[in-house]
Amino acid sequence: MSLPLSLQTLVKKTVASQCLSTDEHCILKHCGLWWHDVPLKLCMDRGQIQIKSGFLGEDIDLHIALIIAVKENNYSLIKLFTEWGAHINYSLLSINTEHIRELCRQLGAKETLEDNDIFRIFTKIMHNKTSGRIILCHEIFMNNPNIENKFTIQLRGLICKRLWGLIEIKETDELNDLLVKYWYAKAVQYECKDAICFLDEKYTDLNEWRLKCLLYYNKIYELHEMYHKEKVQIDVHDMICLASTKDNNPLTIYYCYALGGNINQAMLTSVQYYNIGNIFFCIDLGGNAFEEGRAIAEQKGYHFLSHSLTLDIYSSDASLPLNLKDPEEISSLLKDYKSKNLSIIWEYSHNIL
């Protein structure tokens, strides 16, 4: 006679929470606590159930584990994860057969997933920026027919916000293309090498995008590697402007300036995006586009910045050498650098307030 389901669930949950020797792995296999060729284990993280498995070598939130199990058509784990507390409606994101759909209905799933739920799942997976999370997000969302139009609008908005200045989204841009660029940018930002390799293997046209991401995220060593050794290049004036669209990017701004980039153009781009740190660093390097910058600031409604650029109190920083091109030397130069002109405007502001 079989045990009541609730007791089976409790026993499996207890076993999965234990550290068992390799000699006892046969027990886990017999109990259905085996996934991706390794023991399936439970742990708690800030009150949330996490699954330890062989999938991408990372702990996975229980709800996300359910999505993967559904995508793999793994009937036993779908039931098990649901019994352990996974929200069955998450399954709607990865259902790909009618048999699985019927199983999920029996377990209480709705017919469709709300757009806000889809968006919440996406942001939940991407909350921790690791190679595993980026690859997982790719596997779940890429070419997914279960994604509705409203979610597409939400996701476009998220990408536009997170990559402000790096990407300009057009109505004609395909969601899949935008997703790949977003995941690649996050992989570059957080130095997720496995995710970069994964995306490079799947998509062969990302070299220029990677160069742009390196500029945007102030990654001078990788930028130097691509620009000089791999010979992936774009116009140096475009490069310095792109480096200026995100604030506090002294390394890549300096690097592009040393290559011949127009520092005044970098200054004006920084004004356009209200990147205060970049603006005054450009002035440190000799930028003097004050009139043009003031006009842009006025047009944008940046009143304090507009006023600041009318002041005759700035000058280039003579202590900064302007000809370094080695990333190690540039990093050493700017490691503890404090902008001369930023200090001047802060002192001025303090005195008049």
Curated annotation (Swiss-Prot):
GO BP terms: taxis
Pfam family, one: ASFV_360
Function: Plays a role in virus cell tropism, and may be required for efficient virus replication in macrophages.
Protein family (similarity comment): Belongs to the asfivirus MGF 360 family.
Annotated protein name in UniProt: Protein MGF 360-13L
Organism of provenance: African swine fever virus (isolate Warthog/Namibia/Wart80/1980) (ASFV)
